[in-house]
């Protein structure tokens, strides 16, 4: 999302801000999921986003602004009110994606993660600061409790096999870029793990990543 912070990329911010102003406060019975980003926590606590948060100082807002006019293959105008990701929302989304296919076994890249973020934002209304993972090396666990997909390292041979034999993993050839964008040069793959709905592994292994109330 870093590229979204470039100067001259904020022309669509007015439309995003207007949508935030129009968004109704949602029921407080279901809090945001542990592990979501700052904007989602503000949405849950205040029912809106303080004006102090802008594309200039928040990567998720800048990411949304930079994709306002982008053709992404699904409705550009959000279909539902803006809301923070919840445990149930992440849990249900995980099972939907598992049953429909398309994410399990797909080689991870930042671009693919952004496509997923945009689709979830536009169709479900969940603010895109929920899909974050623990640092590497090794398996990366989701920070958002309820999201049941982790990122697991695979060998170049396995990535090559997936790219050649699995249509859903062939959007980009694994050998082209995957691994090079990772700090530890690992090729990562989305893998469904039902147990992540019972144990918040990220909070246990990396408590320093979570806001202390």
UniProtKB/Swiss-Prot annotation:
Gene designation: nef
Domain notes: The N-terminal domain is composed of the N-myristoyl glycine and of a cluster of positively charged amino acids. It is required for inner plasma membrane targeting of Nef and virion incorporation, and thereby for infectivity. This domain is also involved in binding to TP53.
Intracellular or extracellular location(s): Host cell membrane; Virion; Secreted; Host Golgi apparatus membrane
Coiled-coil region: none
Motif annotated as Dileucine internalization motif, chain positions: 171-172
Region named Acidic: 68-71
Species this protein is from: Human immunodeficiency virus type 1 group O (isolate ANT70) (HIV-1)
Keyword Signal: no
Identification of the protein by name: Protein Nef
Main location: host cell
The keyword Translocase belongs to this UniProt entry's keyword annotation: no
Ranges for region SH3-binding: 75-84
Residue numbers marked as site, Cleavage: 63-64
Region (Mediates dimerization, Nef-PTE1 interaction): 114-130
GO cellular component: extracellular region; host cell Golgi membrane; host cell plasma membrane; membrane; virion component
Record's bilayer topology term: Lipid-anchor
């Amino acid at each position: 999302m870093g590229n979204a912070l470039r100067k001259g990329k904020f022309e669509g911010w007015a439309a995003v801000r207007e949508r935030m102003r129009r968004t109704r406060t949602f029921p407080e019975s279901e809090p945001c999921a542990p592990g979501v980003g700052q904007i989602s926590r503000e949405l849950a606590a205040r029912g809106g986003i303080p004006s102090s948060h802008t594309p200039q100082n928040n990567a998720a807002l800048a990411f949304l602004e930079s994709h306002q006019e982008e053709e992404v293959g699904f409705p550009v105008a959000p279909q539902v009110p803006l809301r923070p990701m919840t445990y149930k929302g992440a849990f249900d989304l995980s099972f939907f994606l598992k049953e429909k296919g398309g994410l399990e076994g797909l080689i991870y890249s930042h671009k693919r993660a952004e496509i997923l973020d945009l689709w979830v934002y536009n169709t479900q209304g969940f603010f895109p600061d929920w899909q974050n993972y623990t640092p590497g090396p090794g398996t990366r666990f989701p920070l958002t409790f309820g999201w049941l997909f982790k990122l697991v390292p695979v060998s170049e041979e396995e990535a090559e096999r997936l790219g050649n034999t699995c249509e859903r993993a062939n959007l980009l050839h694994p050998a082209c870029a995957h691994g090079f964008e990772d700090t530890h040069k690992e090729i990562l793959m989305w893998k469904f793990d039902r147990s992540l709905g019972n144990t918040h592994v990220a909070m246990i292994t990396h408590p320093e990543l979570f806001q202390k109330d």
